[in-house]
Amino acid sequence: MRRAAVVAAVGALVAGFAVYGSAQAQEDPARDASGATAASLREAAAASGTFVGTAINDGLLSNPTYANIAASEFSSVTAENAMKWDTTEPSRGNFNFSGGDRLVDFANRNLHQVYGHTLVWHSQLPGWVQNGGFNAEQLNQVMVDHIDAVAGHFSGELAYWDVVNEVFNDDGSMRQSVFQTTIGTEYIANAFRAADAADPWANLCINDYNVEGINAKSDALYDLVSSLLDQGVPIDCVGLQSHLILGQVPGDLQENMQRFADLGLEVIITELDIRMDLPADSGKLAQQAEDYAEVVTACMNVPACEGITVWGISDRDSWVPGVFPGQGAACVWDESYQPKPAYDGMLTAFGG
């Protein structure tokens, strides 16, 4: 990939952090409680040639336990909300980068790479865009201007950008977002070209959920990505969100990742969590550990799978219970920031 040098440089920083991380080990409550003191997730992933990341709520970085786990256990951080459109450009031409800047500063201090999320998405879109009444030419310019400002602001600071997010319905049809209905499918290529112009250093990704296995939706994604590549659109990677259900890791996950890799693309597990019916018990937690390990193993078996990001650190702060009533316990750390069996499952699968 033409941006490989940037990622390689980040990898060198991550490897260098291993010494620092080892020195912290006895002060890291997550590692002490897990009983797995040979390595952190960060060290184990680096040794395997991959990154391991987490979504970060920049407002929680003032919590020292949260910040310490983020710093010591992960090599990549994704902005949970701080880089989304409703935050970065709540009104036209008025930009707010404070949350994203805090995340980049935290990443720089802890030798993390930064994964930008997301430039164009149908959700968390401010009303002035959603209901602006723009025609196709106008909305395309609004989108390009937004990408130019946001990706341009962080240019050279990020390893990856989710350029477009969740463009498909589950049946493989195009989601009827304001961009799709107004501009047409070409908005996707336009967004990638704009992102490439604004930040030629970041790897540019398309990201979606329920595309982990081979199904109508992932087939549609595969066809779209193939078409973009045929058009010479600067796309570098495919993000598989991987918001999974206990015991339901797709059996063809590895095969699915490999077919995207065979197109010459990187593949990233971008938003991994594995939810269960509450309350959690020892049996469910053991199954969850197996599931997390299965995802890591699938990634490790596909050389183009560059890394795995979990969607949040602790069950305390997870999005899952608010969206799926009666379900939760989806993260690797529990509500008290203690590591669950899933931690050791991931660590072992990484080779730690």
Where are these regions (language model features)?
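Boundary/entry segment of secreted carbohydrate-active catalytic domains
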Residues: 31-80
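Aromatic- and acid-rich polysaccharide-binding/catalytic face
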Residues: 74-81, 165, 198-208, 221-248, ...
